[in-house]
């Protein structure tokens, strides 16, 4: 039987993730982070629940100010891209070698960034170049329908294929694991 996808979040992953976080957050407490993430309920959580839990714990270890936290997240992406290009490069044949990081980082924007449109849109644009952020866009489309649909149009012409893909996939009304986004209903 195949290994459950949720098990990609394991000790090996957290060892790498926390080492990377320590490089961008001077006082990052890797042991404290991992012990809070891998709590007594860890094994019972499914993939999406694990992502949300990791993100919730990560918030405690990032700067309290959302803009500063996003700056650290983007710094983390830059670090990974510059030190492990094989790990961070995606193309149209292999989408998301950074899936494990991306699912956490885009979830951070979804959970905590809805009230800071500008910072979040810039973060989404950058993160989606490493992994898909299509699940993140629905709450923003619902809260900021006109602004976000204009942004989708801008992204549809972006130089990076992942951002262009987000412009298409991110405004689909129904996506697995994403909240429904039914702004426009068919008259039929």
Which ranges hold each PLM region?
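Surface-facing alpha-helical segments and adjacent helix-coil boundary elements at the starts of domains
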Residues: 1-186
